[in-house]
Amino acid sequence: MRSIFIILIFLLFLSSCSEEKAQDKNHEEKQIIEHETQNNETSKATNQEAVNSENTTESIVPANDNNQTDEVSTPASQKQKNPAIKAVKVTFKVDDNDMVLGNKKSNVIVVEYFSPTCPHCAYYHQTIFPELKKKYIDTNKIAYVVREFIATKQDLDAAILARCKGDTNSFTQLHNIILIQQDKWAYSNKYRELLTDIGQLGGISPEEYKQCLNNDKITAILIANTNFVAKAPQFIGTPSFFVNGVQTGNYSIDTISTAVDKALEEQKEKAKNEMSL
């Protein structure tokens, strides 16, 4: 009986040892798995950093001498294919439909293209044109032609008003008022009513203005003026000026005066040469 009891104790001891070994083995396996997982995560993180580093490097433009503007890096052979734009001469035929100020017989013709709603045109008319007029128009040195560029319905209605009577004096008077009062009518929902009021200042009744708005001939002249200059190679908008067919760079008094003086001198030399023949 005693021997059986000893055997049972021994078996229980062996069983306990086996369980501890199994637990130790499981613990070791768990530690191995966790260690491998950590290694894998570390490896993934390292790989991701490498990818990010590569992507970042690709997105950075090296700051060296190769990072230059097209003007510097463009080969000379390629530049020759794109030479600077030269002045292009446009032939203008002045006719009875044109509003001409100054000397209609002058060989120096200055053509102004304007839009009634153009703020720069209004600025030119009030600040630069008076000096130009005094210097060249009032002295009958040039023929100054005023032509419209129609961009909006407001432009069309205002231009029709200025041309309603058809003579230069009426045009000049209404043209002046339209540009001086531009900020009052051009951007108003009631611009037609305001233009009608302006017309009355120039001696045009509401009924006359209404008839002019329905005058296809006036509209055709305005559209023809617009289409003609729109085809000019260097035309970029209003106001624009052409001196004997050559467009000026801008509308400053110095730029226009330089172009006009040059044209006058050329005509003077031409006349002198013709007399010597």
Curated annotation (Swiss-Prot):
GO cellular component: periplasmic space
Signal sequence, renumbered to the chain: 1-22
GO molecular-function terms, A-Z: disulfide oxidoreductase activity
Domain Thioredoxin span(s) in chain numbering: 76-265
Localization: Periplasm
Highest taxon of source: Bacteria
Region (Disordered): 34-80
EC number(s) per entry: 1.8.-.-
Pfam families: Thioredoxin_4
CDD domains assigned: DsbA_family
PROSITE patterns: THIOREDOXIN_1, THIOREDOXIN_2
Entry keywords, A to Z: Disulfide bond, Oxidoreductase, Periplasm, Redox-active center, Signal
InterPro entries attached to this UniProt entry: Thioredoxin-like_fold (IPR012336), Thioredoxin-like_sf (IPR036249), Thioredoxin_CS (IPR017937), Thioredoxin_domain (IPR013766)
Disulphide bridges, residue numbers: 118-121
Family statement: Belongs to the thioredoxin family. DsbA subfamily.
Name listed for the protein in its UniProt record: Putative protein-disulfide oxidoreductase RC0029
Provenance organism: Rickettsia conorii (strain ATCC VR-613 / Malish 7)
